[in-house]
Amino acid sequence: MKSFTLSIAALSLAMSVQAAPSESSHHGQGTLKHWPPAAAKALNKMIARNANQSNFAVFDADNTIWRYDIEESSLPYLENKGVITRATLDPSLHLIEFKDTANYTETLYSYYNRLCEIDALICYPWAAQVYSGLKLRDLKGHIDELMAYPGTIPTSYWDGDVVVQEEINPARPFKGQIELINTLQANGIDVWIVSASNEEVVRMVVSDPKYGYNVKPENVLGVATMMRNTTSGDLTVSRKQIIDGTYNQTANLDLVLGSYLWTPATWYAGKWAAVLTYVDMWKKPILAAGDTPGSDTYMHFNVDVEKGGVHLWVNKSASNWEALQGLIKDNAEGQRENRLRVTADKNWVVVLPTDIQ
């Protein structure tokens, strides 16, 4: 693994330099202090070229703007607290039987993992729907506690027929991404978060000034579930309110999350569908940031490279890197075969999580 890390770091430098101007090398530039020098140069060049021209950038959330996964950590955290249990789970989310034995009662985290083994298209929505029945105000308190939690979260799961004890890391904001997001916004480049996690959970972090991202709540696109006003019985969802001009983040805190999904659903091709629906049908992002092959890459391969746009990749594993290389090759070939300008393999800035934390 050490040799792999070194090779990726070297490749990160090489790919960043391709898009970077010639400047003296130091760790970061200006406000991008928590970035490798070549990456900072490439990003600053792109920002300077695209500043104050009504451009926008898109970011995945988990393992992209913070380290680790906010849903995968909140599930065992809330289960351990007794906030989310089998008893509170919406009946519609009982998709398969729990795998209990005389000596082991399966956790919801384990249940989620077994759904993922069937298909990511099952467990992605399930993880966002699992908050059903919680009031937003209460969930916000739990998420704030989780973000401040100093240790790891104990849980367990089935690996085949063996029970494995696991310690889950809470989400940890990347300082580098906080710098980048704020720098983009300071230069008139709109930032959108497009996440496969629950939209309200992501909004609770990126739109709360204390976490430093300073993303407008209206600019968060995630897996949205219907919310209910328990007094009137009315159903709503933040995205509908935003479209209708009635969105009020504070007033929404008293709404209760449901399990029924709103669409587009922001995973895989749905991420790009959300951009087309809520951001712009024709304009392309000048930066797309992500870490998951096949899901985030629908955004990556639509970056406006003609404007010097950047494909930003946070490389968390060897397997993801290998998968990304295959996708870059396939998309470049697809562009070539269709007589389009080949951009899929251009302007990649690659960093490791440790580079920007």
Where are these regions (language model features)?
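Short, solvent-exposed linear motifs at loop/edge-of-secondary-structure regions
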Residues: 60, 68, 133-135, 145, ...
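C-terminal cap/substrate-recognition subdomain and adjoining C-terminal extension
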Residues: 20-38, 48-49, 54, 141-192, ...
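Non-catalytic pre-domain segments flanking phosphatase-related domains
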Residues: 3-11, 17-61, 69-97
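Short, solvent-exposed coil/turn linker segments
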Residues: 2-3, 216
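A metal-dependent, Asp-based hydrolase signature
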Residues: 70-79, 84-168
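A generic alpha-helix surface/boundary motif
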Residues: 69, 121-122, 200, 269
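Active-site-proximal flexible loops/turns
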Residues: 9, 67-69, 202, 231
